[in-house]
From Swiss-Prot:
This is 3-(3-hydroxy-phenyl)propionate/3-hydroxycinnamic acid hydroxylase. Its EC number is 1.14.13.127. GO terms for biological process: 3-(3-hydroxy)phenylpropionate catabolic process; 3-phenylpropionate catabolic process. The gene is mhpA. It comes from the Bacteria. It is an enzyme of class 1 (oxidoreductase). Pfam families: FAD_binding_3. GO terms for molecular function: 3-(3-hydroxyphenyl)propionate hydroxylase activity; FAD binding. Keywords: Aromatic hydrocarbons catabolism, FAD, Flavoprotein, NAD, Oxidoreductase.
Length: 569
């Protein structure tokens, strides 16, 4: 079905899939006033956990959408992960001590409860609707938008953009006609979620035992996940047998017959990435864009990164602040990092789960030898191996010959600061939901110049001057448009000292779009307006007027019973 090119969209964005990526994206769009429709083929949210680990970047995103305080009660912060060999000798430990982005790096969590909080957050917006029991059938793109049709007698919907957050078997991806390149492991695992944790300790472990590798993860609220490798001569039917499940649990607990099993299932690991994250007015996020093994707990978090990266860009285009070309930077920025996460997760899985005793023994000797080297031990302990976003292309501006210490393309830190009115607040709460221009102890209006200052102000940017605490209340060049913050922990002074750049242009997703010394701020600001595809006037986007129609949010239907398996490609 094709809509006439001049048809007025019913909504700005259709999000296909009410999983974590789709719900996070809908919250971001909702906060920016974007008329959004979320559709899902199920009749309710999935009620069983898939992901079990939240990282600091995801919590920072939940902070940005105003839901972190509702999420935190369902988490286990600062969760330690230990790796043991077959004799239960410690191979490695991950216990990252810092919280440079404002939150712990490793957190166990109960996904259904966190997803429910994301879903509940949409009740804040009259212009966001969720429709369950809507299976997308097709997308027909025109110059003016996309017409989405559904199975049955559901009415079609016209939108300006469609984002597929519809999982590994994504219908959106098939409609786009893009590949899903990669591999599916031949190794199968039995995952068992249990209530009333029979172990009861707060942390997690991986048993790298070649006889049968296993995982034991404390989630939250007394829930624990066990995972056991299934041998090649064991069928899926055998692994699904309750007696087999109890036998596996008996390897880890003394009374397996007393364990309260919530759910068990057999799954395999996928290492796949879509050929493109964008094609015209259709985009992909979350598992629809990439699948990765569980070993780094980054599948869920990578989907949240997608939403954070894409959300502000979609809102800027729909609201007329940027041209459509800004959306091309989504694929440029997210693809490389998602690929790095897939590769790391795949590699860690190969290290953890060899069943050849000779290879496992060699691995153990190498790791034990490396652990006596302090720098290598810290590298693992502090999770320094985790790939961090560093965008060389996209919605960022780099000098022709950038300094090796340039922070451009990386995430800005989030220490706690003082303002003149509040104490001990997280920096992002001062920076606000949009763009921010940040400097170290300088007159920001004078540094930028009136033209650049006014243009950033017209885009809703906030201006923040960071100072030593001794200067917090000095009124020398106070400006009503500039928020002064005191560096209560010293983290900002240390950060600016290392980077050497003193003026930062920070995107809504907290990536540093550009950085420079004070004297170059006007020219870097001008260059950024070009690479960010920002419009000077802030009128309509490149594809017609913004839709001013709104849709109402509907309540969630009754809970779906357990037993539905996640799809595989």
């Amino acid at each position: 079905m094709t809509a006439p090119s001049g048809s007025t969209p019913d909504v700005d964005v259709v999000v296909v899939g009410a999983g974590p990526s789709g719900l996070t994206l809908a919250n971001i769009l909702g906060l920016q006033g974007v008329a959004t429709l979320v559709v899902d083929e199920r009749d309710t949210l999935i009620d069983y956990p898939r992901g079990v680990g939240l990282d600091d970047e995801s919590l920072r995103t939940f902070q940005a959408i105003g839901l972190v305080e509702r999420v935190l009660p369902h988490t286990v912060p600062n969760q330690i992960l230990r790796f043991f060999d077959a004799d239960r000798r410690l191979l490695a430990e991950m216990a990252p001590p810092d919280a440079r982005f404002g939150w712990p790096k490793r957190n166990g969590f109960v996904q259904p409860l966190v997803d429910a909080e994301l879903f509940g957050g949409l009740e804040r917006f009259d212009h966001v609707e969720v429709r369950f029991d809507h299976r997308m059938q097709s997308c027909s793109e025109t110059a003016g938008g996309v017409t989405v049709t559904f199975d049955g007698d559901r009415d079609p919907v016209r939108a300006r953009y469609v984002v597929g957050c519809d999982g590994g078997r994504s219908t959106t991806r098939r409609q786009m006609g893009v590949s899903f390149d990669g591999t599916t492991s031949s190794t199968r695992w039995l995952v068992v979620d249990v209530a009333n944790d029979p172990l009861g300790h707060p942390n997690s472990e991986v048993g790298a035992d070649p006889a049968r590798p296993y995982v034991s993860i404390s989630i939250a609220h007394g829930i624990r996940r066990f995972e056991f490798m299934i041998h090649p001569d064991e069928t899926d039917e055998q692994a699904d047998d309750p007696a087999f499940v109890r036998r596996m649990l008996g390897q880890r607990v003394p009374y397996p017959e007393r364990v309260d099993i919530i759910r068990h299932r057999v799954y395999t690991h996928h290492s796949r990435i879509a050929g493109s994250f964008r094609k015209g007015r259709l985009m992909l996020a979350g598992d629809a864009a990439h699948l990765m093994p569980v070993w780094q707990g980054q599948g869920y978090n990578s989907g949240i990164r997608d939403a954070a990266n894409l959300g502000w860009k979609l809102a800027a285009v729909v609201n007329g602040q940027a041209d459509d070309a800004l959306l091309d930077t989504y694929d440029l920025e997210r693809r490389k990092h998602a690929r790095a996460m897939i590769d790391l997760s795949t590699m860690v899985g190969k290290v953890i789960s060899p069943t050849n005793r000779g290879l496992a023994a060699l691995r153990d000797r190498v790791i034990h030898a490396a652990s006596v080297v302090p720098t290598l031990k810290r590298y693992i302990l502090e999770m320094r191996f985790k790939p961090m976003p560093r965008y060389q292309q996209g919605a960022v501006y780099h000098d022709a010959q950038p300094s090796p210490t340039s922070p451009t393309g990386t995430l800005f830190i989030q220490p706690r600061v003082d303002t003149r009115e509040e104490f001990n607040v997280l920096l992002d709460d001062v920076l606000g939901p949009g763009f921010a221009v940040v400097c170290w102890s300088n007159n920001l209006r004078a540094v930028l110049g009136d033209e650049a200052f006014d243009r950033w102000k017209g885009l809703g940017a906030r201006f923040v001057e960071a100072r030593p605490m001794t200067q917090l209340h000095w009124p020398g060049y106070d400006d009503a448009d500039v928020e002064v913050v005191g560096d209560r922990t010293g983290a900002l002074k240390k950060w600016f000292d290392v980077s050497t750049d003193s003026v930062l242009f920070v995107r809504p997703d907290r990536c540093i779009a550009g950085a420079c010394i004070a004297q170059r701020a006007p020219e870097v600001s001008t260059a950024l307006f070009a690479v960010l595809h920002l419009t000077r006037e802030g009128g309509a986007g490149s594809h017609g007027e913004k839709s001013d129609g709104t849709v109402l949010h509907v309540a969630q239907s009754a809970a779906e019973p357990s037993g539905t398996s996640a799809g595989t490609p």
